[in-house]
Amino acid sequence: MAVGNVAVPETIYPIEGIKLSATAAGVRYKDRDDLVVIEIATDAATAVVTTKNAFCAAPVRVLREHFAKASPRYLVTNTGNANAGTGADGKRRAIDICAALAAKAGVNNNTVLPFSTGVIGEPLNSEAIIAGLDNALANLAPDNWLAAANGIRTTDTIPKLTSKKVNVAGSHYHITGMSKGSGMIRPNMATMLGYVATDANIAADLLQEMLSAINEQSFNRITVDGDTSTNDCCVLIATGAASSDIIDSPEHPHYQPLFDALAEVFIRLAQLIVRDGEGATKFMTVKVTGGKTTQECCDVAYAVAHSPLVKTAFFASDANWGRILAAVGYAGVEDLDTEQVDVYLDEVMICQNGGVAPTYTEEAGKTVMSRPEITIHIDLARGEAIDTVYTCDLSYDYVKINADYRS
């Protein structure tokens, strides 16, 4: 059961220059869409980031090769099978899918980027995907975002979709995005896919820089189970349909408002993944302040967010704050003065100067821990740096979902 506000927005803005479709190809699931195609306008700029897992999936390898050679026109995603751990045959099948779509659409093979998500180590039924391409291409439409968001789901219990309109000095821009992911989530880029499009006119090189920076604030600041997937990919597309005035540097007056709006969309999509974490009952924000560097704040936040002992304590609504201190201690911060560290659960100080806070009571701790959304605030008191990671608790259902995944 997803935690908190996970509703699809009432208004989903179509992005001029983007068309989508979702089709049932029968890759793994019966009676549901599992093949999603996105068509990108010719003049659009596209940026991509991919998993840092060395055992990356075949479609990721093909995607990287194609993206280095041409500007994308089509994105093709299948669910139910990751096409990872499939060797040379898996790569050939990813290439075959791209070639088939390219031939049907009349574009170069390199302009098609493949994406897969699902079970690792099983041969991909590329024939079923290729057979579904005609229907996918025939049903492309600008208002199919919700269908596409449902089509990319695996163990996700909800479609993950957000959309917003941005007004900047009289110019109107739209941003719409979708993501998928529920388990195997600890991006360095998890089984996580994200697709965001805007009608802003942004230079390709700058768009790539923006995506890399925004990704660090969003998809690279979430964890469900600490596992980095073989298939993570995130795409940002700028079609340019809203304006002929190109944003080509951070000094452009529209750059910062657009950057902030895009970051808001990405953070929302990343948080939706955590809120829908496999078996999750609580959404946790781990905020670390007072660090010497952002990196040490990040290290501490991830140590706490990854800890099975911390996560199970939150599932049990048990204010066992010693587990948080232990995680802070093994995060690898050099010369940490533990007698300066303070820890809060929401508004309740549980640890002051490295020991139990004089004002803390078990009753106050239990009250906070019963909430579905909780912020763990750790103040290292050694600098001005800050960082935040989003995670969820670890429940019995997480084990059941993953134990039963292939059955």
UniProtKB/Swiss-Prot annotation:
Active site: 191
EC number of this enzyme: 2.3.1.35, 2.3.1.1
Pathway(s) per entry: Amino-acid biosynthesis; L-arginine biosynthesis; L-ornithine and N-acetyl-L-glutamate from L-glutamate and N(2)-acetyl-L-ornithine (cyclic): step 1/1; Amino-acid biosynthesis; L-arginine biosynthesis; N(2)-acetyl-L-ornithine from L-glutamate: step 1/4
Recorded GO CC terms: cytoplasm
Pfam families referenced in this protein's UniProt entry, alphabetically: ArgJ
GO BP terms in the entry: L-arginine biosynthetic process; ornithine biosynthetic process
Assigned protein family: Belongs to the ArgJ family.
Known role: Catalyzes two activities which are involved in the cyclic version of arginine biosynthesis: the synthesis of N-acetylglutamate from glutamate and acetyl-CoA as the acetyl donor, and of ornithine by transacetylation between N(2)-acetylornithine and glutamate.
Protein name: Arginine biosynthesis bifunctional protein ArgJ
Origin species: Psychrobacter arcticus (strain DSM 17307 / VKM B-2377 / 273-4)
Taxonomic lineage from the root: Bacteria, Pseudomonadati, Pseudomonadota, Gammaproteobacteria, Moraxellales
Gene that produces this protein: argJ
